[in-house]
């Protein structure tokens, strides 16, 4: 039986003794101290992973109880994820760390339909969530023998420079006199999954800011990509991190205050160097550099599959992952054919969306109706081949912990909310034909002939058989 645990809340009645990242900077002027408690146990029969597939926590915000539902982001890492750094003599060193049982989650607040959450549970709960229209952060506090966390609003973070910051891409606005077209007018084939594997490179200044601590840098970037994925899922577009490269022993290009020169140099380096080592479709350069003209990011337009131009550069704006994620999602949007929003563009009733030319405060996590139309128009017209192949398997572990289900189990019963699978018995629910797979839709086998995978090269498309949830390889069709 699942037991619900009560939560004890303690407002800050004791001296502050340090916390993590943002609070440690001393730039937060008001916060609550809370003690989150897990309120849902691992379902029966689930594997004993260190980080469960689904979790639920309860705490209070402004005196009101909050229940945070979390689900592991199984698509965060590509199946061949790697990390690269350089020795002092310039030797390239690449490792392949195990990221199967990772600690990055997305979620929502119970009874708040507009809520979102992007959380890491690596060492306590750290990240941000949207509650009743306001953006909050949560971080573990460094208090001896304590589970204390700090919760604070984005608006309570003091920023060094409040002047408007902007994207360096110019003359790209949505034409204000152009009617907002409906996506239904486009001839889209949503049966074909679009997905991109990205590389994130960090410069030497970013390393210095984080004391050259690769573990801290790694977690920062993972949190950023986790948040970006949340924004792009509303575009029906998948993103996975395939490589993290750190330049802590010196930059491999000339990083300048001129954003265009830095973008150009990074693109040339990607074409001449990075592409030879890592199979990917897009690269983003994260820097602790302040560009001239209040620019915080820049990218090439309509360039997602170009060896030199499928890149963007991103400033470590205020050192906040939410800000960095918004900028990186914005610059990737330009690579994917999306322009800046015009005056008639909205997202959930707001005019402050990801593709606004200036970053909002707090930054938006949503693309506008204009962005959605432009993105899919670009996909339809250009049909960029490098994003058509979703990885055959992103990192995720079935409940049994094996590639295949254990004997006697018909489906992955790790989530009690799976509509196809009975979590108590690991059997398919009555009427269900399947629980997951490229050819499984709403618990039924997909129709025969549906395209389920587009292979690279000249091989024909892989198609569902109508008799299985698996997507067979072409050579097995005959």
UniProtKB/Swiss-Prot annotation:
Entry-listed glycosylation sites: 279, 369
Cofactor: Zn(2+)
Disulfide-bond pairs as recorded: 207-248, 305-386, 345-370, 347-353, 411-426, 413-421, 420-443, 434-440, 439-464, 452-471
A GO CC term attached to the entry: extracellular region
EC number: 3.4.24.-
Ranges where the Disintegrin domain occurs: 397-478
Binding positions (Zn(2+)): 330, 334, 340
The keyword Coiled coil is annotated on this UniProt entry: no
Chain positions of motif Cell attachment site: 456-458
Active site residues of this protein: 331
Superkingdom, natural source: Eukaryota
Cofactor binding remark: Binds 1 zinc ion per subunit.
Record family assignment: Belongs to the venom metalloproteinase (M12B) family. P-II subfamily. P-IIa sub-subfamily.
This protein's name: Zinc metalloproteinase/disintegrin
């Amino acid at each position: 039986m699942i037991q619900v645990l009560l939560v004890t809340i303690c407002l800050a009645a004791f001296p502050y003794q340090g916390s993590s990242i943002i609070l440690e900077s001393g730039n937060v002027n008001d916060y609550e101290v809370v003690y989150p408690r897990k309120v849902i146990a691992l379902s029966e029969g689930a594997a004993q992973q260190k980080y469960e597939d689904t979790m639920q926590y309860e705490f209070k915000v402004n005196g009101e109880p909050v229940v945070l539902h979390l689900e592991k982001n199984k698509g965060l890492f590509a199946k061949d994820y790697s990390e690269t750094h350089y020795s002092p003599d310039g030797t390239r060193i690449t490792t392949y760390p195990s990221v199967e049982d990772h600690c990055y989650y997305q979620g929502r607040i119970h009874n708040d339909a507009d809520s979102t959450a992007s959380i890491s549970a690596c060492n306590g709960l750290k990240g941000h969530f949207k509650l009743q229209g306001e953006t909050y952060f949560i971080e573990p506090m460094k208090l001896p023998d304590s589970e204390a966390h700090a919760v604070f609003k984005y608006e309570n973070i003091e920023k060094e420079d409040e002047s408007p910051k902007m994207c360096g891409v110019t003359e790209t606005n949505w034409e204000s006199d152009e009617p907002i077209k409906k996506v239904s007018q486009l001839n889209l084939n949503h049966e074909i999954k679009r997905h991109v594997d990205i590389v994130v490179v960090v410069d030497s200044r970013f390393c210095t800011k984080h004391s050259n601590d690769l573990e801290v840098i790694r977690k920062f970037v993972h949190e950023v990509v986790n948040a970006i994925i949340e924004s792009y899922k509303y575009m029906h577009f998948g993103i996975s991190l395939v490589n993290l490269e750190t330049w802590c022993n010196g930059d491999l290009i000339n990083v300048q205050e001129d954003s265009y020169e830095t973008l150009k140099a990074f693109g040339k380096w990607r074409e001449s160097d990075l592409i030879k080592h890592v199979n990917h479709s897009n690269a983003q350069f994260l820097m602790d550099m302040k560009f001239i003209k209040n620019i915080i990011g820049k990218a090439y337009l309509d360039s997602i599959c170009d060896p030199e131009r499928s890149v963007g550069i991103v400033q470590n704006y205020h050192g906040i992952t939410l800000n960095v994620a918004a900028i990186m999602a914005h610059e990737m949007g330009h690579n994917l054919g999306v322009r800046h929003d015009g005056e008639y563009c909205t997202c959930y009733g707001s005019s402050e969306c990801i593709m606004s030319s200036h970053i909002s405060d707090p930054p938006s996590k949503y693309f506008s109706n204009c962005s959605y139309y432009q993105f899919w128009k670009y996909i339809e017209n250009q049909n960029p081949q490098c994003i058509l192949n979703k990885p055959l398997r992103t990192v995720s572990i079935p409940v049994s912990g094996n590639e295949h289900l254990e004997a006697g189990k018909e489906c992955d019963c790790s989530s009690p909310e799976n509509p196809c699978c009975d979590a108590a018995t690991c059997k398919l629910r009555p009427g269900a034909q399947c629980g997951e797979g490229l050819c499984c839709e709403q618990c039924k086998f997909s129709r025969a002939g549906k395209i389920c995978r587009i292979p690279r090269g000249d091989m024909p498309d892989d198609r569902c058989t109508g008799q299985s949830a698996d997507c067979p390889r072409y050579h097995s069709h005959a």
